[in-house]
């Protein structure tokens, strides 16, 4: 009988715990504060501002920001595990072991609401998850006109203790433009894609059209055979021997002679050197020069796909 009674009481307790809600805003009144702990960076500030901005758009109420926890308000912590003054509940500490890459931990209990990430980029993702899941916010297209923000007087979160990790580390699509729209990277970030930038906590992504970086045009004067044969003449990648800069880097007018083993050897050595100089780079993109002028020497022609050669390409 006692065992049955205990089981029943325990079940009721668990149901009540699962049904617990922690209001950030109630009837249009702010009941929570964002606590900015010591040791934070621009990313923590930005993530907190995003939460504050969109909760205000939803409810009309402004979450306060503080340097220390409030005794009256529900405290919100957006931080990395090493933030000074952060006191994680035991359950949150245990779950933190499961966080990887730019994933995040969401924990909500009587102690407060915690958005914790090992990589700062994950802090933004954690905030956006809260706004999407409990605020119904959606960012459909870049810019204010492309966002959907429901209006209501309340904003609450249930009891939370979960880890959200990405399925794969790098998530993005490249917008091919020399002058990308400023709002587009933010829109991508809000939709879970990886972005560079100090506010986004992005990693270092290097490379691009770098053949002319890996094979400097300065070598043209002594080794023209490394460079592309175009209309019967070997040319540097800048297109004109008279325009070779002091460093000889950055030309994009044509491609080098990629059938020459020495060309490949030099490019390989310079690539390894670049990688060693940037050990923290998350990705390194290696693209040909931004030009359709390929080497027309006999050996390079042999590398052309037959269908393109037949079309004179």
Predicted features by range, described:
Residues 11-12, 19-105, 152-163:
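Acidic, contiguous N-terminal accessory segments
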Residues 39, 47-50, 54, 93-313:
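Feature activates predominantly on carbohydrate-active enzymes
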Residues 2-3, 20:
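Charged/polar low-complexity intrinsically disordered segments
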Residues 3-4, 99:
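Intrinsic disorder/low-complexity segments enriched in polar/small residues
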Residues 16-17, 22, 66, 133, ...:
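Hydrophobic alpha-helical segments
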Residues 4-16:
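Sec-dependent N-terminal signal peptides
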């Amino acid at each position: 009988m006692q065992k049955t009674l205990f089981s029943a009481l325990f079940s009721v307790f668990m149901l009540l715990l699962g049904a617990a809600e922690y209001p950030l805003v109630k009837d249009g009144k702010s009941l929570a504060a964002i606590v900015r702990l010591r040791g934070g960076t621009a990313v923590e500030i930005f993530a907190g501002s995003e939460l504050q901005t969109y909760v205000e758009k939803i409810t009309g109420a402004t979450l306060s920001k503080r340097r220390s926890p409030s005794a009256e308000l529900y405290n919100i912590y957006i931080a990395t595990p090493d933030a000074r003054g952060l006191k994680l509940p035991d359950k949150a500490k245990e779950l933190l072991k499961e966080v990887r890459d730019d994933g995040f931990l969401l924990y909500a209990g009587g102690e407060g609401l915690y958005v914790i990430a090992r990589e700062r980029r994950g802090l933004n993702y954690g905030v956006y998850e809260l706004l999407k899941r409990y605020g119904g916010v959606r960012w459909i297209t870049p810019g204010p006109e492309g966002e959907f923000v429901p209006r209501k007087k309340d904003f609450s979160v249930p009891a939370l203790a979960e880890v959200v990790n990405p399925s794969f580390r790098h998530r993005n699509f490249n917008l091919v433009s020399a002058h990308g729209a400023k709002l587009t990277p933010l829109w991508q970030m809000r939709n879970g894609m990886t972005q560079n930038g100090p506010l986004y906590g992005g990693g270092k992504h290097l490379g691009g059209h770098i053949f002319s970086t890996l094979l400097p045009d300065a070598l043209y004067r002594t080794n023209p055979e490394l460079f592309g044969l175009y209309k019967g003449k070997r040319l540097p990648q800048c297109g004109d021997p008279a325009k070779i800069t002091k460093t000889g880097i950055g030309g994009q007018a044509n491609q080098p002679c990629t059938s020459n083993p020495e060309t490949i050897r030099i490019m390989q050595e310079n690539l390894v050197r670049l990688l060693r100089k940037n050990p923290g780079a998350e990705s390194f993109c290696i693209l040909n020069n931004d030009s359709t002028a390929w080497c027309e020497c006999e050996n390079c022609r042999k590398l052309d796909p037959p269908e393109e050669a037949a079309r004179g390409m």
